[in-house]
């Protein structure tokens, strides 16, 4: 049975992006060795991997209290665009220290998070 997901963000500055998830978003992590942090996500994992050339990904983190998260980003001088309203939620694009981007959104729709058996 599948118990979760492992998300990989390829990064041109993995150390800086790891620090962002650890220090700004305060995601708990385990050290997989040699500084490779694996972050806990409900119910998935998030890892930073170095990239050669163009890095690409699309990751949106769901935030039931988006305004509070934006206040934290502002306090840490993290650049972001938005918020903008979409049919499915309020959307923000966040610039990671490496220059890659992730999205944050506060959903307006029912979520499936509670459907996974625990």
Predicted features by range, described:
Residues 26-57, 61, 94, 101-108:
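Conserved short beta-strand elements that form part of the metal-binding/catalytic scaffold
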Residues 5, 34, 89-91:
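Short loop/turn microsegments at loop-to-beta-strand junctions
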Residues 1-18, 45, 57-59, 108-118:
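N-terminal beta-strand motif that seeds the catalytic metal site of vicinal oxygen chelate
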């Amino acid at each position: 049975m599948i118990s979760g997901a492992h998300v990989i963000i390829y990064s041109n500055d993995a150390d800086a992006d790891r620090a962002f998830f650890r220090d700004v978003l305060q995601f708990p992590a385990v050290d997989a060795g040699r500084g490779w942090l694996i972050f806990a996500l409900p119910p998935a994992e998030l890892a930073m991997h170095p990239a050669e050339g163009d890095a690409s990904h699309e990751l949106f983190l769901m935030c039931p209290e988006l305004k509070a998260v934006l206040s934290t980003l502002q306090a840490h001088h993290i650049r972001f665009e938005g918020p903008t309203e979409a049919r499915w939620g309020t959307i923000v694009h966040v610039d990671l220290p490496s220059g890659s981007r992730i999205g944050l959104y506060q959903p307006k729709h029912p979520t499936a998070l509670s459907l996974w058996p625990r």
